[in-house]
Amino acid sequence: MKLIETIKKYAQTQPDTLAFVNEEEKLTYGELWSQSERLAARIQSEALTDASPIIVYGHMKPVMAVSFLACVKAGHPYIPVDVSIPADRILKIINSSKAELLLNNSGTSVDTGDALISVVEPGVLEGDGVPETDPGRWVHGEDTFYIIYTSGSTGNPKGVQISADNLQSFTDWITNDFPVESGQVFLNQAPFSFDLSVMDLYPCLQSGGTLWTVTKDMINRPKLLFEALKQSNVNVWTSTPSFAQMCLMDPSYSEELLPELSLFMFCGETLPASVARQLKERFPKARVFNTYGPTEATVAVTSIEVTDDVLNKYSSLPVGSEKPETEIVIINEDGKAVQDGEKGEIIITGASVSKGYLGEKALTEKAFFSYNGSPAYRTGDAGYKENGQLFFLGRLDFQIKLHGYRIELEEIEYQINQSRYVQSAVVIPFYREEKIEYLIAMIVPAEHDFEKEYQLTSAIKKDLGSKLPAYMIPRKFMYQKEIPMTANGKIDRKRLKEEVTV
């Protein structure tokens, strides 16, 4: 695979160049290659089923990149799982994936329940002599390279399989069609269990750059983040728009703080025109790109540079035109392609489309199909095309994007309704300036002994904390005697939305 061969070349020609930096550790290309070779040999000694997935558990440490590379060198796809993921969800991923090995890079124990899975702590990967893996064993072509778990409507996460060819097509697009130069410093804001991280990790490594990671502690302590950014020399900023918006709240977030910054790449949620405008004012030398794509189509498939002309022309920004080897079609409810300017469902076809969900044949057949001989994916997103530009209009169903994370409201509702304190619940997104700011849980409570509503809320949140990641737990909880229904006997979500926005 070109990506792996390129990393090997950098390990040989520039072994002392930094590949990965976080607040505590650094890793060179030479170390990345040698340590991943040793770990790959260790993985191969485990006698795993051919091509079985390996869970890689941890946070923003260099050993995570070492582990990813080791897995694919050993012929196995990896499943990144961040330490922020609750234990209950990790168990579901273990059981769903049928993974036989978990690489624990967290420094703490991980509960694997009664699953038949080996847990290995990579530990010391230094040493004399470097074993050489057989390139013939490396993941390549249509082999699965990584599997990222996304929100599922039944309360069970779905594993999206991305092949080596999918990833190579995406990485080549970023390094060839965006103003990315060799040896640049890439900011990595997203945890590795979120596919936005793929937008910086692999283009960075393919271009001989340095990945500079933002940890949970930095996000929780902006002062620490800004002190670190000042020393970062970041050239390429990859994040959700929400993260940049948070940074813009500090007046010091400007060209003076990051004088080397030349490129912003956004994905994961809608980029408000107001945010793009502020960034161009604060960073006049930097170029801003808006992109769009679901996990099932390898991170992103469209892009547009947000210039002054674009900002003057559109109040809501387009998400751009397709990458090479990709076509986007807008279809109506009958499955027929619509005319330019007509709204419908966004269908993605071509080299970026995933092979489907791991172990979920029915779900795969529902979402993935062949369109004019090419692999295609039904996004469930609403949109339209105009003069070659795609406009994203949100979800057709109840799946949403919140701070870059794709969330199915049904999954949150399912988990809230499992609480003994809840009779019924509906989750409503609260919008501000064209994007979702937070979630509101509308609850009909079951009988309870709490005197105050905040005590009830705390108890429900405690139940949710063991089942859902923090970003999926609603910010506000509102209580009422009944959930309004439509004449058809369905939950009246429109009325609920109107009530919470008054």
From Swiss-Prot:
Pfam family, one: AMP-binding_C
Binding-site list for D-alanine: 195, 299, 490
Binding site for ATP: 150-151, 290-295, 381, 490
Catalyzed reactions per annotation: holo-[D-alanyl-carrier protein] + D-alanine + ATP = D-alanyl-[D-alanyl-carrier protein] + AMP + diphosphate
Domain of life: Bacteria
Main location class: cytoplasm
Biological role stated in the UniProt entry: Catalyzes the first step in the D-alanylation of lipoteichoic acid (LTA), the activation of D-alanine and its transfer onto the D-alanyl carrier protein (Dcp) DltC. In an ATP-dependent two-step reaction, forms a high energy D-alanyl-AMP intermediate, followed by transfer of the D-alanyl residue as a thiol ester to the phosphopantheinyl prosthetic group of the Dcp. D-alanylation of LTA plays an important role in modulating the properties of the cell wall in Gram-positive bacteria, influencing the net charge of the cell wall.
Protein name: D-alanine--D-alanyl carrier protein ligase
Gene source species: Bacillus licheniformis (strain ATCC 14580 / DSM 13 / JCM 2505 / CCUG 7422 / NBRC 12200 / NCIMB 9375 / NCTC 10341 / NRRL NRS-1264 / Gibson 46)
Lineage: Bacteria, Bacillati, Bacillota, Bacilli, Bacillales
